[in-house]
Amino acid sequence: MADFIKHFVVVGGSLAGLFTGIMLSRLSHDVTILERTPAEALAGQGAGIIVHSIVPPIIEATVKLIGSLSPIVDFLEEYDCTHTISYVSLGKCGIQYLKRDGTILNTAVPVGLKELGSASWDLLYNVLRANFDGVYATSYVEAVAREEGGGKAVYLSGARLTSIQDLRHEGVKVDYESSNGSNSSLIADFVVGADGPRSTVRKLLLPQVERTYAGYVAWRGTVKESLVSEETRILLKSKIWTVFHRRGH
């Protein structure tokens, strides 16, 4: 078993990094997650997350690959030991296409979709954090004991990756800077890049790859219902997904 156990360094401690870290740890591997953002600055990342696939091609591909409409729900059922209610079912909602003036152009319900589940980044993050290292807890997510046989799990906040060096048969050397300015190193068998669109891993390993403009800008945020008009509340309440039609924004 000792020869089988590997040390993974996951760069990026948001949802993708935690999904990866939990799975590897439950397979008895040792995992260290490096998250460059300090813990206190992570709260409130993202207004909302739909936990089911809603785009027809993605639905078809997901069902064909894993037989599910929600890999997130499946993952939580398999790995969540906190038994926290992680999403709210919104029923069989559809997608609203709006014109620029706010009127509804069309409403569609993806074929095969039985329900939509809504969660928040904060909720999913806290549930995953509690499941990763067994010492994290919040007012609504309890700490859980580590499962027997699981690998070591370490989550380092404020740890900024600075370099990656292939040591060949000796592994991979990972250098990082802590929030207090000190420099440290880790030796890993594998390094996983899960550090988002501004990936330092990609910048270090594939410096020739540059981000390209997709042709649009997405903005999202939250607003209190009391601050919007009654007409807007009704429009947004009737369907969970509202998108502007092409050439309409």
Regions found by a protein language model. Give the residues of each.
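Glycine-rich FAD pyrophosphate-binding loop
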Residues: 9-13, 22-47, 60, 64
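Active-site-adjacent segment of FAD-dependent monooxygenases/related oxidoreductases
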Residues: 40-154
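N-terminal Rossmann-fold NAD(P) dinucleotide-binding loop
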Residues: 17-18
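Extreme N-terminal starter segment of soluble prokaryotic enzymes
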Residues: 3-8
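Conserved FAD-binding catalytic core of PHBH/FMO-like flavoproteins
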Residues: 130-249
